[in-house]
Amino acid sequence: MRLQGRKIAILVESDFYEPEIYYYQHRFAEEGAEAHFLSRLWGQPSIEFKGHELRAPLRCDESFEGIGDENLGQFAAVIVPSGMVSDRLRYTDDVEKLPPATEFMRRVFARPDIVKGIICHGMWLLAPTPELVRGRRVVVHNNLFGDVKNMGGIYVDADVVVDGDLVTGRAGTVFHLFARKIIDMLAGDTA
């Protein structure tokens, strides 16, 4: 088990892609890592989210909003998954302020010791903070090509792209390749 005792945070909301989320639950555990599903809980102790394809439930009882900078380092990686998760998480009551999930990712990006994983439409979450992507090599779903260009990212036509501490994946259907790259990086395997 190459990731024994490590923690991986996965942001979640309704309309998640079930095969991807279930794969992370099991695959990271196989390597000894704990998968922690984080969301905005809106003052509730937990929320049950529904998947996109099967409407399968996923209960979340951990919020990224309560994680201070001193506790951010408990996570070896933070993943923004595919589906509509990022679109739902980028909602904010006050349009003059960053959405809480985007603010969380801004703090994650300030930590080079944390691997950042963004797959498919997950890049939407960073749209309000283009400086996090500007000049970095990334891949996204074809629908987000224009968004990445507008953010100043360097689009690479590949299924998975690594740029330092940032791993990006083209589409939710390549979650296995995306997860493998994150596992290899966390295990120190650079091949």
Model-derived features with residue positions:
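A short beta-strand/loop micro-motif in the catalytic core of glycosyltransferases
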Residues: K116-G117, V138
